[in-house]
Amino acid sequence: MAKEVAGQIKLQIKGGAANPSPPVGPALGSKGINIMEFCKQFNAKTQDKAGKILPVVITYYADKSFDFVVKTPPVAIQLLEATKKKSGSAQPNRAKIAEITWDQVKAIAEDKLVDLNCFTVESAMRMVAGTARSMGITVKGTFPGNN
C-alpha cells in the first residue's frame, strides 16, 4: 500500500553542502523530518555537482519518512556561469551586462529541458533567451529556428 503524502518542501541548496543550519534545518525540522539523514543522502547524491545551487523537492509522508528529487540548476544561475558574472543587470532594458551565443543558449536549454514546461529544444531555447533578456544579457545573432 502506498504511503500517505503529508506534503512537499521546495528548497535551493548548494550541491554537496547541505547542513542542519538554516534554511535546511528549520524547514525540515518543523515537519518532523530527520534533518541529518536528509543532509547525508543529499550530499551523497550531489557530490559531483558540489558548489552549484540545486533545486530540490522533498516529499514527506505521514510516517515522517521522505523522498527527494534533485533538479538541474536554475537557468539564471547557468546564464551567470556562462557569462562569468556575479549578478544580472539592475536595469536590464538599459544596461546590458554581457552577451552569449545561441550555441550557449542551446546547451543550457538542452540541460534544463527535463525541468522546463516544454517539449522541444527550440521552445526551451526561447525560454532561456527570455530569462537572459530579463537579466540584461544579450543573445547574439538571430534565432536558429528562423529560416
From Swiss-Prot:
One of its GO terms (cellular component) is cytosolic large ribosomal subunit. SMART domains: RL11 (SM00649). CDD domains: Ribosomal_L11 (cd00349). The keyword rRNA-binding applies. It comes from the Bacteria. One or more lysine residues are methylated. InterPro entries: Ribosomal_uL11 (IPR000911), Ribosomal_uL11_bac-typ (IPR006519), Ribosomal_uL11_C (IPR020783), Ribosomal_uL11_C_sf (IPR036769), Ribosomal_uL11_CS (IPR020785), Ribosomal_uL11_N (IPR020784), Ribosomal_uL11_N_sf (IPR036796). GO terms for biological process: translation. Pfam families: Ribosomal_L11, Ribosomal_L11_N. Gene3D superfamilies: Ribosomal protein L11, C-terminal domain, Ribosomal protein L11/L12, N-terminal domain. Transmembrane segments: none annotated. Part of the ribosomal stalk of the 50S ribosomal subunit. Interacts with L10 and the large rRNA to form the base of the stalk. L10 forms an elongated spine to which L12 dimers bind in a sequential fashion forming a multimeric L10(L12)X complex. Belongs to the universal ribosomal protein uL11 family. This is Large ribosomal subunit protein uL11. It comes from Parabacteroides distasonis (strain ATCC 8503 / DSM 20701 / CIP 104284 / JCM 5825 / NCTC 11152).
